[in-house]
């Protein structure tokens, strides 16, 4: 099952990668046209996107983090975030990550860039 947004302004969708580029239980770093880095996750066949940089420090979640179910752990201070919502789940992280609406179409992963200013 994929995480699909029902109503999306198609002008705000940006293609990031193919679904085959993100292995089950893995994290892939991608960049928006603005250069802003996102982390793409695949859990149980669903795809999720958050900002790639931990809200507590400057660690890349895709490069240094680890995925455990629906939570990503930052390797710097072991804070955790729910990849579905961006919610901070473990200290020292107090501020959520931005999570991005994901659409999967034709084997491609898109995010709604209208969801957040970058």
From Swiss-Prot:
Cofactor binding, note field: Binds 1 [2Fe-2S] cluster per subunit.
Residue intervals of the Rieske domain: 14-111
Pathway: Aromatic compound metabolism; p-cumate degradation; acetaldehyde and pyruvate from p-cumate
PROSITE patterns named in the record: RIESKE
Molecular function terms from GO: 2 iron, 2 sulfur cluster binding; metal ion binding
BP term (GO), one: catabolic process
Residues given in the record as [2Fe-2S] cluster binding sites: 54, 56, 74, 77
Keyword tags: 2Fe-2S, Aromatic hydrocarbons catabolism, Electron transport, Iron, Iron-sulfur, Metal-binding, Transport
Pfam families: Rieske
Induction remarks: Induced by p-cumate and repressed by CymR.
Disulfide bonds: none
Domain of life: Bacteria
Its biological purpose: Component of the p-cumate 2,3-dioxygenase multicomponent enzyme system which catalyzes the incorporation of both atoms of molecular oxygen into p-cumate to form cis-2,3-dihydroxy-2,3-dihydro-p-cumate. Functions as an intermediate electron transfer protein via a specific interaction with iron sulfur protein components (ISP)(CmtAb and CmtAc).
Protein name: p-cumate 2,3-dioxygenase system, ferredoxin component
Protein source organism: Pseudomonas putida (Arthrobacter siderocapsulatus)
């Amino acid at each position: 099952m994929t995480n699909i947004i029902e109503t999306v302004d198609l002008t705000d969708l940006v293609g990031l990668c193919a679904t085959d580029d993100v292995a089950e239980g893995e994290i892939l770093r991608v960049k928006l046209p603005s250069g802003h880095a996102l982390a793409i996750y695949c859990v149980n066949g669903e795809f999720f996107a958050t900002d790639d940089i931990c809200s507590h420090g400057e660690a890349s979640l895709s490069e240094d983090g680890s995925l455990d179910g629906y939570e990503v752990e930052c390797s710097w201070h072991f804070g955790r975030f729910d990849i579905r919502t961006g919610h901070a789940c473990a200290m020292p992280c107090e501020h959520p990550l931005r999570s991005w609406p994901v659409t999967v179409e034709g084997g491609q992963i898109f995010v709604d860039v209208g969801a957040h200013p970058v």
